[in-house]
UniProtKB/Swiss-Prot annotation:
Origin species: Homo sapiens
Residues involved in substrate binding: 53-54, 213-214, 248, 262, 326-329
Biased composition (Polar residues): 1210-1220
EC number: 2.7.4.24
Domain notes: The C-terminal acid phosphatase-like domain binds PtdIns(3,4,5)P3 and InsP6. Despite its similarity with the phosphatase domain of histidine acid phosphatases, it has no phosphatase activity.
Compositional bias (Basic residues): 958-969
Protein name: Inositol hexakisphosphate and diphosphoinositol-pentakisphosphate kinase 2
Amino acid sequence: MSEAPRFFVGPEDTEINPGNYRHFFHHADEDDEEEDDSPPERQIVVGICSMAKKSKSKPMKEILERISLFKYITVVVFEEEVILNEPVENWPLCDCLISFHSKGFPLDKAVAYAKLRNPFVINDLNMQYLIQDRREVYSILQAEGILLPRYAILNRDPNNPKECNLIEGEDHVEVNGEVFQKPFVEKPVSAEDHNVYIYYPTSAGGGSQRLFRKIGSRSSVYSPESNVRKTGSYIYEEFMPTDGTDVKVYTVGPDYAHAEARKSPALDGKVERDSEGKEVRYPVILNAREKLIAWKVCLAFKQTVCGFDLLRANGQSYVCDVNGFSFVKNSMKYYDDCAKILGNIVMRELAPQFHIPWSIPLEAEDIPIVPTTSGTMMELRCVIAVIRHGDRTPKQKMKMEVRHQKFFDLFEKCDGYKSGKLKLKKPKQLQEVLDIARQLLMELGQNNDSEIEENKPKLEQLKTVLEMYGHFSGINRKVQLTYLPHGCPKTSSEEEDSRREEPSLLLVLKWGGELTPAGRVQAEELGRAFRCMYPGGQGDYAGFPGCGLLRLHSTYRHDLKIYASDEGRVQMTAAAFAKGLLALEGELTPILVQMVKSANMNGLLDSDSDSLSSCQQRVKARLHEILQKDRDFTAEDYEKLTPSGSISLIKSMHLIKNPVKTCDKVYSLIQSLTSQIRHRMEDPKSSDIQLYHSETLELMLRRWSKLEKDFKTKNGRYDISKIPDIYDCIKYDVQHNGSLKLENTMELYRLSKALADIVIPQEYGITKAEKLEIAKGYCTPLVRKIRSDLQRTQDDDTVNKLHPVYSRGVLSPERHVRTRLYFTSESHVHSLLSILRYGALCNESKDEQWKRAMDYLNVVNELNYMTQIVIMLYEDPNKDLSSEERFHVELHFSPGAKGCEEDKNLPSGYGYRPASRENEGRRPFKIDNDDEPHTSKRDEVDRAVILFKPMVSEPIHIHRKSPLPRSRKTATNDEESPLSVSSPEGTGTWLHYTSGVGTGRRRRRSGEQITSSPVSPKSLAFTSSIFGSWQQVVSENANYLRTPRTLVEQKQNPTVGSHCAGLFSTSVLGGSSSAPNLQDYARTHRKKLTSSGCIDDATRGSAVKRFSISFARHPTNGFELYSMVPSICPLETLHNALSLKQVDEFLASIASPSSDVPRKTAEISSTALRSSPIMRKKVSLNTYTPAKILPTPPATLKSTKASSKPATSGPSSAVVPNTSSRKKNITSKTETHEHKKNTGKKK
């Protein structure tokens, strides 16, 4: 018996070699084989009764293979021949029946079989008759209170089709007295008839769109026919405006639904297909109402596995079709989930009858209880992040005064006179501006109008920029027009002719500032890393870090909203981040359309406010005045410029010494740069060279020439406002166009950065009061929104308030994690940080932790791309509801991407860490910064190999310390230092990451004694799974020293690796009290952490592939770490012991219109800070940069393929190596980590 396969496909089984399926069934051990006389265990037989096209489809096979992994389940597929031709008495026997109708299926026979054998039926058979009639479907939906488009039914007698209640007009039809204006939809009443027609109004050209079942690349065709069909019965319904997408929802039981959107077939009838020929499906998040709809549809139609179509329109969700039994295509995660849920439903129902020892499995990730960084066992309730956009091309703008009547006409046409301002971004609007520019330039050839002539170079530039990409997209260009009643005042840099008093328009053209490919990678990587802040990941999916979030997400327990300002780079950053966060695939555009909300409607993330301009103008004037003095900075200048005592500012001022002399140097370096570019352009070898992001040398020259011209004005003074643009441009060229090897670029970078480090932060205020006033001007709407996000967590989900009967299982509010992500530009990030720093959230003189956080922020000199401010809210369910201790808020921060210099002086915080009270068990230590990978030069051996050393080789030492600044050079044994993880070989980076984030389930309350009880294996499943994955990376790379070998995903972009390790600060997580005895645990349970008990090799392989981390061999020196994507500074904890009440009162004080600038802010003496030895030293951060991927030699490619083949599509519960012990492990694991709620309901 042990030799026979347990997954049958009818009589063809004889042709199957059981060996091919060996890993799907339980093999008896040799000892068991000797005891043949013991009775075999009773198997539950699951019968699959459907047409062969369905039962042998890829999704069905994938799911059945996984169901077969249940130890007590055997799957039998009924042959089509038997179904169609044999009486039901001859059909195979089964205990559970999965049967569903499709074209040609004898549903009557299936019903008779179910009556005869009385198996447990997964999808009710009688209801499948009703699903075939759209009228019945609509009737059931209506009875359930589910929204439908407005509809009417036209029933025709086939023998007398003319007698019916239909009146047809030119642009409407009237059915049974109900009028439908075009566009409307006409559907046959039979659900099997897919010929749905949509009729268009004459104003839009009339005609109709005829939809049909997909044929090749078409799903509909336009027809000039405008009259409705005259034979047959139809449902007429209102056409819903859905932005061209339909949402398909697939349930597996009432508590699980997978949703995806596809391009609506009504749009143009062309099926969008990806490179592999599959229809493009977009990711979708169901909202609370839609989750409830899925729940209702599943139960109302009694179909456990059920697909239905949703239309999202007018802020509502309407069901327009219920398809019955259907599976998601091409989603390995769905296959895993579906098989797991179905297997559990079967076991729960039938195991007791057959006396099979099976208990209701509890899902390890059921309630998101996670270790907070302050050492308490709490439930994560809310994550709020404000994030700056990723790496972008330099922003460019050109101003010109225009007086031509055509511009005034356009201004009037677009209602510009209402506000005196106009922003043109839409393709049609930009086309009109381009047409005017072309026309004026043409006129210039015919007559010499002086006003037009004056603007000729600018008109040409306007035309060039608007023609630049061959198409318009609001993402990369915009034109602003401002009405000037008395014309434009002439500046010193322009011609000093007499000023004209007539009205004119100021035209400002903005372009550039697009997200670069590097920026997309940064955002996607950060999204991937963000997953790791979420709970879970202990179950079958523990093949890669952060899987807990994906799990939360697909089981309705993640309430995610992503907001972005209206700038293209910000929206694309948000989409790329979402792609990484939710493990999505494909292009960013569909993700953007489906997932990113534009927040510009209420000024949430855009800054068009005029209230801040007066204060900012005063600040800018003072700043310019100080920086125009041709002398070394005096003590008075230091006092004027750095009243807040910012270390980074003082450092920049020391470097600059004399601002005018530094500007002279910068100017001469720009002149040198432009002459070098001109020289290159004359060189025939490099004249047509392609620079990064398709820029040409000519465009690069134009960019720098404009800066050269604008930086130094006619009177010899420097325009300080151009410094950020100069820094922007040189940073871009150093980072992306380094291959040009232009001279002195690093010197220009260093000087312009020093100037920008003063100008940029100080433009947002010099004194604390100014910083706060300006910050409020930008951020008040956002602060209000953050406050409401934190407050709403305490309320039940709206659905639960409306429908208490449904307040159970996955809909219960305490199981939700709310995530709100706000993507914005530099101004909002600076402003929000100013509010946190200077708004009196905490008192530095009384709160040691806050003082250290402020000291750290004083050293941060730039809020670079991908800067993050993260607020996390936790709930302790054991505390009284009214207690201040019930809700706990943490504040984290990262200054974003690292700079271009190999900067050893990166500011270092105190880690993503446990609270300062957890000092018991501290050990003396010594920090050895030489092991930090980013300090290694290109010619050194890469230390990442040492860093990711296998956990098995050595016991891991966790050093517990209290968080104080780290010194780069020395740290004496008795010096207080941050909690950190280190080992003799420096295994720290990954240990911090695994033991602290989403690892342990239980954490002690801050201040309690650390107990010595060992951590349960379950609590360390996540840790071990990551260690498992990384062990494989390391072992692969250990081989690398002998054989050049890489795990390369075929589709991976070969220039960009990816990483996640360094995105949480490495200083402390390993000391996490969720695993106080990890060191002993690792010593005793080494095997468990890395062998079969955790995850198998194939799954590990897939985890590695998901993380696209690979090492590339340096031709001469072993290893090289290289990437054009700058790595991102780790997230550092600013405070981890805030109460929700404290944060709420603080946000309320900032958001209230009358709030004065708080005076409570503890002042820091700038002199004291300057003299502080701790703050003068800056320490390096331990961050791993992705390696460059080299092609894999053919010999090793085969072995890599072989090792990773079973798991190519991600960690799957079906991937089991061919060993009996592994089989047992997987089975028991499947039974211990099942989805609780899917087993808690009777069908």
